[in-house]
């Protein structure tokens, strides 16, 4: 994947403003609420029976932060995303059996969360760079499936 200097700048400058705990929790909660079939991968998280329960669930919050923290590794390693996510791809494919389509869904949700949090800074150019990034990350995570 080739990243222009502008794309790299747009991604890293926005990332510097992201509250990983809050945005990660919101992104995962939205995924579980908007796409309820994804909840089956999180049965050990306890009560996911309603949007209120999901939003207030500390395990959802903690895992959302973990997910977005690992996304930060992509931001730091834009030129080596495939290798950055090799182990996570293996885990999600071989052990967790996560449908790779869920990676794309989470990427789309992350775009919505970023747009909501950074409306003024989330220009069309910024969105284009982030769409490319979430697509590349989703592809890297799905790599072990192919």
UniProtKB/Swiss-Prot annotation:
Boundaries of every Globin domain copy: 2-146
GO CC field: blood microparticle; haptoglobin-hemoglobin complex; hemoglobin complex
GO molecular function: haptoglobin binding; heme binding; metal ion binding; organic acid binding; oxygen binding; oxygen carrier activity; peroxidase activity
InterPro entries referenced in this protein's UniProt entry, alphabetically: Globin, Globin-like_sf, Globin/Proto, Hemoglobin_b, Hemoglobin_oxygen_transport
Alphabetical GO biological process terms: hydrogen peroxide catabolic process
Gene3D superfamilies in UniProt: Globins
Subunit architecture: Heterotetramer of two alpha chains and two beta chains.
PANTHER family hit by this protein: HEMOGLOBIN FAMILY MEMBER, HEMOGLOBIN SUBUNIT EPSILON
Descriptive protein name: Hemoglobin subunit beta
Species per Swiss-Prot/TrEMBL record: Phoenicopterus ruber
Biological classification of the source: Eukaryota, Metazoa, Chordata, Craniata, Vertebrata
Gene (UniProt): HBB
